[in-house]
Structure formats: C-alpha cells, structure tokens
C-alpha cells in the first residue's frame, strides 16, 4: 500500500471474502493506526474463517502506535523490541530511573535510545577514539546482555541486531495508558536469525571521505 494512504478500505475489502484467516499489517506510525482501526471497523477482529478466529497481526508495535489506535488495539497480536514490564535487572533499573525522572514508564523508543547510547559510548571507549570506522569495528560481532531481551548480537556481516523477540497482544483491560500491550510469548533469537547473504549488498570500506 502507498505510504500515507489514509483510506485503506480498498485494500481491506478484498480480504473479507478471500478465505484468508490472517491479515498482516506491515505498516508503521500513522499508517498502522489507520489500517488497524479500519480493519477492526470492517469486522476482521471478530471474524471467523473455517471455524478459526481471524487474526490481525502487527509486525512491530510502538507505544505511540498502540495509543493512537485506541480500542482497536485490543486482542491484536504483534511483536515489540522491549516492554517496561520485563523483570530482568537491567530493565527494572531503567524503568525505576526513568520513572523517577519523568513520572511514567519508558516506551520502547526510549529504551532503544538508552541502549544505543550505552553501546556507542562503550564502543568509543573500547576503540579509544570517536573515529567512526574504529567505533564500527568494535560493534561488529559484539555480544552484550542485561538490556531486557537476553543475550544480543550485533552481527558483523550486515550490522543487524539479533535478540529474543517479544510477542505481545493488545490488552483487553489495560490499567493505564502505558499498559496497552501484554507480553504473551518470547520467540528465541535462534528462530529469527537468517543467512546474511540472502540479501546481498556491500557495507562499504572502513574509511571516512572528507
């Protein structure tokens, strides 16, 4: 679908009588809010196909998207990179310090910024310089833990970050505007890793062109 389509009815209508029992809304931001809200309005969340409940899936949730979709989020499956309800020591420490400063639990985006800042600072320290190519080399193949989703790898070959994936479902009875997504399962990292060569491409040389 075109980015910023707004009206997704022409794409949702054919799904109604297609025989499909899953709709994956591979959208982000306002497009996800609009497409999900409209899919629910069309009755897909309550639909049954061949005796099975129809499922709407959002591949990657954010708090702002969940809040923007309102009640349409209830019961909807998806994934997220982190959730403030995690009980590992790193997550609890971050939630406590963030809450003390801002009066609310951190979002997934806040967690990402926090983790990336720590990783960059650590890479600069290991490299002994801010020179980008040397910092990059420190991050390539770097393993770390303690940030919420278990052992994590920055793969050297394509710079992709791999960790356990949280499967979430929109909370039917949220206790607050921050309790919209409930973790229902965790997919192990090994199940989402893939062969880096399938997409081809080159990362480029370790040099900065002036």
PLM segments and residue spans:
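Extracellular/periplasmic ligand-binding modules, especially the Venus flytrap/periplasmic-binding
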Residues: 29-32, 84-142
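Solvent-exposed, acidic/polar segments of extracytosolic/periplasmic ligand-binding ectodomains
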Residues: 143-210
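Venus flytrap/periplasmic-binding-protein-like
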Residues: 3-4, 45-71, 136-144
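Rossmann-fold dehydrogenase core element
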Residues: 71-81
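Periplasmic-binding protein-like
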Residues: 19-29, 35, 48-59, 109-110
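Active-site-proximal beta-strand/loop segments in catalytic clefts of secreted hydrolases
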Residues: 1-2, 25-29, 58-62, 79-82, ...
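Extracellular/periplasmic Venus flytrap/periplasmic-binding protein
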Residues: 1-42, 84-93
